[in-house]
Amino acid sequence: MSAPPVPVVKPRLTFLYNGEFVDSDLQTKSVRESEDGRLYETFTIGGTLEVTTESIRHGDAIEWVSWFEYKGISDKSGQVTQLCDCNINVPFELDLYPDSLARIQEGRTTLVYAHNGSDWNEYDFSCDVESYGDRVLRKAALSQLPRYRAGNTNVKHFAPIGGRSSHGAFPFYNINQGDYGVIFAIGWTGQWNCDLERALDGTINIRTGLEDVDWHLLPGERIRTSSIIVMPYSSGYEKGQQAFRRLLRDYYSLIGKPGRPERAPLCMSFWGGLTSDGLVERIDKIGAERLGYEFAWVDAGWYGQFTEPSPNEFEGNWWAYTGDWSVNRHFHPDNLEDVSAACKRNNLGFLLWLEIERVNTKLPVVKAHPEYLIGDMIDLGNEAAWAWAYKTIANLIRRLNISCYRQDFNITPLGRWRDADAVDGRKGMHEIKYIMGLYRLWDSLLAEFPHLIIDNCASGGRRIDIETLRRSLPLWRDDYQCPANHDVDAAQNHNIAISRWLPYHGTSSGRIVGDTYRARSCYAPAFASSPLYSSTENPENLSDDDCAWIRRINNEFKKVRELMQGDYRPLVEMSPTVDRSTWSAYQYSLKDEGFVMAFRRAKSPFCEARFELCGIDPLKSYLFEDSDTGQTFTISGKELSEKGISVVIDQPRSSKLYFYKAIQG
């Protein structure tokens, strides 16, 4: 039997209004289209609750988001519950079982590719592949992580932990059956949820929205809820994933857009608790030695009025002053303006860390404006609190010529929102207004500062979704890389998994100099290192050999980064946990060129591996260059297509990087 035709997906949302089921497909709508191709479909419930769904198509993909507005003059609208911002049915054929003991035929298993989110673990971003049929089957090479277990039924439930969109779960999914499938991604930087349910005929119902809502609107209130991208495909799993990455790169990311940086940044990072003299000395070292960095990244610890030393993130009480965003004049007597000037004279962008949403409740802003808070969070849904947050950030960007604003968020907000909801009886409303305020904050900053990029941290990669990706990029995708000598094999796993989805993300190789395996393990579209991070690392101790190695690595990374604009493909199937007896490898291809990166891990007994490459033209030949030695060799496209490429790595815990380009056959 042939696969179902690729469906044309249309927006559909459902909810209960005062207990009555509302289906947008069954409503009479007014429709208008904007000049940029956006479609606005509006219907009204009960004569007073106006619901507008805004949608736009990019090729086979469609995105939509819904807005709710109360037009009545009485005290409130009816009650909205069981809201599904997306409620669609996607046709899939039943999995075939020739007999009770046989395996499902290849290509006829329906698989749900659901990746883990970030949770400071080695298995972050790994994939849990679940099949739907008369039984529950799994690919043997991938383990089931019990966090997502919903029982051996035809319903599977997904949700993040604690109100941050990619904490524990990852709001990007691919349901695949052979060549046919559908990718969808949820846009909500709070507590979304997703249910997948399979019908007896094989159809899969996709339901996404905000978790556990029960609210009404007041006169004049207008809110939005979660967005969704749905992209059907008929080209197979790998090409479907590549198409989705291109979609995010071309239509959602700010990188490469007018006024913004052409590429994600290459940074040297510093602890903000260093003195200004120490920061200036380190930044001048970058320029004097021509190390090749593009941004100076100043992290936490630069703010608050304390005098005790804070030599690194693990010493001192800098954390107690989070929420006081005045520069610490004891350690930075020139108000960080000398640091900004050092960046400018060394042709570096200035990246500065803040955590604008979290505040120590003993600080002056809390005493002056307790109404700004939900617990220990600045309430971005409160207009006065929002204005304070915007003014605080914008003044720093303007005064210090900030090129990249780094926003962290190290708390789980869900319980705080729910506690606030309990006061006024509108479950989910504080979350909705808070998240709308977050989007407005970033949109306003990007509008006022056309050069700006926003780094979205949130404890390392815990707020990654399509709404944050259109406004920011995660330069620090996981806090598992926090230790100075973090496990780089885990970084390889993270990189290989998350690159399936995101065209732009990053991490850091840490403070260790001279370890090429470590540095290459952390190459991503954005990359950082910190050889002069804290008071422990003295610029005078950075030798000529150290500087030469840093220059070589940064130059190599920039060459890699250009090719990361292309299509990505992992060349091995990784286990969720780190296996040091294996190899890991991946490929990027951009038109007729690309690179292959391979790692032989510390306990691998194998000195050779062969990899099948994608994007190879059998009628052409390909010139390969070894990045370590500069040696070149040629392989015909026919041989590459039939046999792949053999990579030899003689020593354990070593890597090989080959650049290649097509030449005439």
Language model regions located:
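Polysaccharide-binding surfaces and accessory modules of carbohydrate-active proteins
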Residues: 2-197, 211, 621-634
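Active-site-proximal substrate-binding groove within the catalytic cores of carbohydrate-active enzymes
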Residues: 9-11, 16-25, 31, 209, ...
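Glycine-rich, aromatic-flanked loop segments that form ligand/cofactor-binding clefts
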Residues: 11, 16-23, 171-187, 233-253, ...
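Conserved, mostly hydrophobic/aromatic
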Residues: 66, 220, 296, 343, ...
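Short Pro-Gly-centered flexible turn/kink motifs
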Residues: 215-234, 653-661
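Alpha-helix-loop-beta-strand connector modules within alpha/beta enzyme cores
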Residues: 336-343, 430-449
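C-terminal beta-strand-rich structural cap/linker in extracellular carbohydrate-active enzymes
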Residues: 635-665
